[in-house]
UniProtKB/Swiss-Prot annotation:
Predominant place of localization: cytoplasm
Lineage of the organism: Bacteria, Pseudomonadati, Pseudomonadota, Gammaproteobacteria, Pasteurellales
One GO cellular component term noted in the UniProt record for this chain: cytoplasm
Coiled coil: none
Catalytic activity reported: L-threonine + hydrogencarbonate + ATP = L-threonylcarbamoyladenylate + diphosphate + H2O
Presence of keyword Nucleotide-binding: yes
Molecular-function GO terms, alphabetical: ATP binding; double-stranded RNA binding; L-threonylcarbamoyladenylate synthase; tRNA binding
Name under which the protein is recorded: Threonylcarbamoyl-AMP synthase
Alphabetical list of InterPro entries matching this protein: DHBP_synth_RibB-like_a/b_dom (IPR017945), Sua5-like_dom (IPR006070), TC-AMP_synthase (IPR023535), TC-AMP_synthase_SUA5 (IPR050156)
Length: 184
C-alpha cells in the first residue's frame, strides 16, 4: 500500500477515493461531510433516495449512526458474528443521521469490514467510510486499482491494494427479520 498516506489525506480533505473491499473496489468518503457525500452521489449518478452503505472495522465507528435503543444483545451478536460472506446489515438509524446517508429510509446500512485496507483507512482517519461499488453507470464494478484508473482516469485517488478476493458483493440483510434484500 504505497500510497496509503495520500489516500488518508484525500479522505481527511473530504474527497472521494477508491479503495478495495471484500470483492470489488468501493467509492468512499467521509460520511460526516455532506459536500463529500454529494460529490460521491454525483460521480456515481446515484439517487440520494437509495441511501448508502457505511463500513468500518469496528462497531464503535458505526455507533454514531445506529439507534442502539432499538437493538437487543441478540441483534448485536448477529451483527458481530463473523461470516464467510460479507454481510451488510440494515439497522435502525439515529434520528440525527442525515438523509443524504439514509436516503428515503429510517434505517442505515452498515457492515463490519476487516480487510487490511479498510482497517488502515478507518484507523488513520478516525471515521467509517461510505461504500458503494466503484464503477460508472452501466460499467462493471472495478476489481483492481488499474481498472479504477481505466474507468475514472489516471489521476483519480485510488488505494493501491487488493480486494479480499470474494466473488460477490456483500449480502444485504435486515437485522430484525434476516430478510435478504440482496443476495451475496
Amino acid at each position: 500500500m504505497n500510497n496509503l498516506e495520500n489516500i488518508v489525506e484525500q479522505l481527511k480533505r473530504n474527497r472521494v477515493v477508491a479503495y478495495p473491499t471484500e470483492a470489488v473496489f468501493g467509492l468512499g468518503c467521509n460520511p460526516n461531510n455532506e459536500s463529500a457525500v454529494r460529490a460521491l452521489l454525483k460521480l456515481k449518478k446515484r439517487p440520494e433516495e437509495k441511501g448508502l452503505i457505511l463500513i468500518a472495522p469496528t462497531k464503535e465507528l458505526l455507533l454514531p449512526y445506529i439507534d442502539e435503543n432499538k437493538l437487543t444483545a441478540a441483534h448485536w451478536q448477529i451483527f458481530e458474528t463473523p461470516s464467510e460472506r460479507a454481510i451488510t446489515w440494515v439497522m435502525p438509524a439515529k434520528k440525527a443521521v442525515p438523509q443524504y446517508l439514509t436516503g428515503q429510509f429510517d434505517t442505515i446500512a452498515v457492515r463490519l469490514c476487516c480487510i487490511p485496507a479498510v482497517i488502515d483507512l478507518c484507523e488513520r482517519t478516525g471515521f467509517a467510510l461510505t461504500s458503494t461499488s466503484c464503477n460508472l453507470t452501466g460499467q462493471e464494478p472495478c476489481r483492481t486499482a488499474d481498472e479504477v484508473k481505466l474507468q475514472f482516469g489516471a489521476d483519480f485517488p485510488v488505494l493501491e491494494a487488493e480486494t479480499a478476493g470474494k466473488t460477490n458483493p456483500s449480502e444485504i440483510r435486515d437485522i430484525f427479520t434476516q430478510h435478504i434484500f440482496r443476495q451475496g
